[in-house]
Amino acid sequence: QHCDAAELRFVIDQGAAGVVAPYIETLEQVNVLCDAARRRPLQGEALRRFAGESGGDRPELRSYIHQRTADTLLLLNIESEPAIDRIDELVSVEGVDGVLIGPHDLSCNLGIPEAYDHDRFSEALREVVAATQRHGRVAAMHFMGCGGLELAMAWRELGFTTWVQHADVYFAARGVADEIGRLRGEAGASVNVVI
């Protein structure tokens, strides 16, 4: 699966506060991402040497890198059964801030498409929350309106503390649709609107 440290470094260097790393399933992927997010700008041999050193070998560099990356957010997008099976291992890595569940993809990968009230789906969510709580990480949910607010509240009760509520395109489209509706209501249904 795609896990590109160079892309992660690029978006953070361009000003992103952090990243949601898509479709994470392995410890190797997490380690690559943590190195890129938490040890920028080091790469290659310099990164390998730095990662293997004790804290006292280069205190100025350690301090600089810690200050430079302390506010960088790294969330692992958990969307598959292998990720659920390894969730404790994945979130135990120092440098991971938390996970973001993609409910649609996870439900499909569990073989129960959009069955958000299915016992298998709920059990997977409980496993994720338990692991994040054990390791002091954030449990976030990508909520695109699936199942309504009642379902969102049920997920909150499970222990999810952070939400991605829709997306910017959704809000823009909804705003435009509302404006068109008002315009047609005031000007008559026969008005043509060009966007």
How does the language model describe each region?
Residues 1-195:
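Expand to "…catalyze enediolate/carbanion chemistry for C-C bond making/breaking, isomerization
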